[in-house]
Amino acid sequence: MPSQSGMNPADLSGLSGKELARARRAALSKQGKAAVSNKTASVNRSTKQAASSINTNQVRSSVNEVPTDYQMADQLCSTIDHADFGTESNRVRDLCRQRREALSTIGKKAAKTTGKPSGRVRPQQSVVHNDAMIENAGDTNQSSSTSLNNELSEICSIADDMPERFGSQAKTVRDICRARRQALSERGTRAVPPKPQSQGGPGRNGYQIDGYLDTALHGRDAAKRHREMLCQYGRGTAPSCKPTGRVKNSVQSGNAAPKKVETGHTLSGGSVTGTQVDRKSHVTGNEPGTCRAVTGTEYVGTEQFTSFCNTSPKPNATKVNVTTTARGRPVSGTEVSRTEKVTGNESGVCRNVTGTEYMSNEAHFSLCGTAAKPSQADKVMFGATARTHQVVSGSDEFRPSSVTGNESGAKRTITGSQYADEGLARLTINGAPAKVARTHTFAGSDVTGTEIGRSTRVTGDESGSCRSISGTEYLSNEQFQSFCDTKPQRSPFKVGQDRTNKGQSVTGNLVDRSELVTGNEPGSCSRVTGSQYGQSKICGGGVGKVRSMRTLRGTSVSGQQLDHAPKMSGDERGGCMPVTGNEYYGREHFEPFCTSTPEPEAQSTEQSLTCEGQIISGTSVDASDLVTGNEIGEQQLISGDAYVGAQQTGCLPTSPRFNQTGNVQSMGFKNTNQPEQNFAPGEVMPTDFSIQTPARSAQNRITGNDIAPSGRITGPGMLATGLITGTPEFRHAARELVGSPQPMAMAMANRNKAAQAPVVQPEVVATQEKPELVCAPRSDQMDRVSGEGKERCHITGDDWSVNKHITGTAGQWASGRNPSMRGNARVVETSAFANRNVPKPEKPGSKITGSSGNDTQGSLITYSGGARG
């Protein structure tokens, strides 16, 4: 039986190639081809399953391929010189060292993508491994991958915060970190290399990997399949293949010594080369004093302060400074100019120094505010010859500007050795005038010839030098700019130049309109038939037939314009005077030509509103500023029809005899259709006696608290409206001047009866004022006075001692003050005392239990917890 002969496919899964061949030959020798057919069928089925699984893995691998951290580390380690990374070169070296350790442990698959291989996978031979060795290898690979990922994350964080620490490779590091973050954001943790598989897996399982044993492959395909499986699962415990060809000897970057000669920079910006003694990140123990400034020779570069400190100290003063002289030549050495830290050398700082210039131009400008001027002529001049442009240096053979009389022959050609340079402009600065000058006209044209304009060396030609000349222009535009500081008006062109509508040029005498010519406005904007002789530049401008203006009162006037025009002369007289009668010109006439605008005339018909809001129109009969003599009674109220509007009276309150005590009357209106007008406040009508008698003067001396403005009494006496209380109401009360107090009804009746009789004014009796008041002796009646001021001759209060006359309700004058008038009978008011005999309802029991502070005898109505009822 095939099952008994050992040809079961399940038993062949763990055999090698030689063992399979030996088993096949043994089966053929015992059973013949029957055993081969069963084996072939089972092998074909396993081959198809392996092919299908390989195709699926190939599709999946093309989707899940993502760059790993090892590939990103390859880009950083590809730089030959790690010193280009600046102060973080040691960190990059550590990253490259970890990458090489991972490659030496895992192999080249650490640098590949995380996806599965895209080919058919063939299992390796079964090799027996030690389980402990496999687990240790897996842990080592996992730790190396984690450390590489952490190191790359730290480098990216430094590149984001301080990219200058990577030196010239800062942009490369940031680009790599940006690609890493993009991969993590798109693919998540798949962008991070997973835990590498154990190298002993295929050897432990042998040929049990699905698809590894493929008998259908022969020769080249089988070798390719074998290499793919070695690439995927490794060689197990077998040693790796040695490289073929020439091997380049390379020094490990981790063991490489630092450079002997490095370049640094001082705080002043100078470059320093040699062995660097700055602080390094991999050296500990030198942290104290890292950020302190060093006096003397600077052996600590600015890179140390940039890497480890947040601030940079100020550089020391330079020993050798480079300054410039007044002529711009550099001078180096110890600076001896004035400084702000030294006092006492202010005298003579801004004076010119003769001899050698040791004061720099920069110091002169900073201390004096102006640039230094050269004190003497240059001893050595530099120039170039006119023909061959060779440099000529030495004493200047040209005439200086302070020497006159050597103008003759200054511009002639020199034979022999040429000692003059090509700077001909220096010869004519203060020398003789040129024979042929070049000037410009007002229109901008060039004029050459003998200059006949005004000169600074010629006097007597000042008259008329700035006037315009008609005819040929022989005065240059430069003369007006230098002597007159004005720009003359350009004369019209004799030959004009214009363009047609199609862009063709037209020259000759222009027949276009001009601003100086009037009367040719009609037809200026019309089209021209026939030959086009020009294009109108000024279109329109004529006077309109109908124009709209506004009169002084604001009324609109339209029609033909009759006011002053700029193109019309002779009508200036009386142009700013007002016109009586119908206004045929408005405000637009006065504003551009007159200094002021006249006031409009009075309106014949006026419209206003009464205090009740009624409209009144007609002739104005109120007071006016232009009319005098009607001031009397202008503020008095008018009975009957109201023919005076609210604009004149301001809606004043009515007479006091129509007012009732305690009632507030509000009179007035606001017109929303017309603009608001401000009116002067009128005089307040008198509400008291117009003749001040001694009796009235005595009453005015009475002072006290003013409670009259409100006109109402509040509080417990709220039903006492109309009662007279206090001093202010006594002062203005309607009562008899003489006699005893009367009831209110009787007093009002007597007042109405005596209103028709003439009032007899009492005689004024002159009284002598005592020089000083003398306190009266104490009496028994004075003891009835209580409160402030009961002491004799000592009055206390807010403001009782403002004068010599003591008034009020204190002292010996309290019992003899004016008696108050008796008012109407008061209504008996009910107080809380009357509720004592009223039966009270029984209090219900408390319905709240468990509350804090509850009481059965508490209040029935409360606002917090524990209320009863």
From Swiss-Prot:
Span list, region C-terminal peptide (CTP): 839-869
Annotated region (N-terminal domain), positions in chain: 1-259
GO biological process: carbon fixation; viral translational frameshifting
UniProt keywords, alphabetically: Bacterial microcompartment, Carbon dioxide fixation, Carboxysome, Repeat
Bias kind Polar residues: ranges: 37-65, 265-276, 848-862
Biased segments, Basic and acidic residues type: 564-574
Protein name: Carboxysome assembly protein CsoS2B
Species whose genome carries this gene: Halothiobacillus neapolitanus (strain ATCC 23641 / c2) (Thiobacillus neapolitanus)
Organism placement in taxonomy: Bacteria, Pseudomonadati, Pseudomonadota, Gammaproteobacteria, Chromatiales
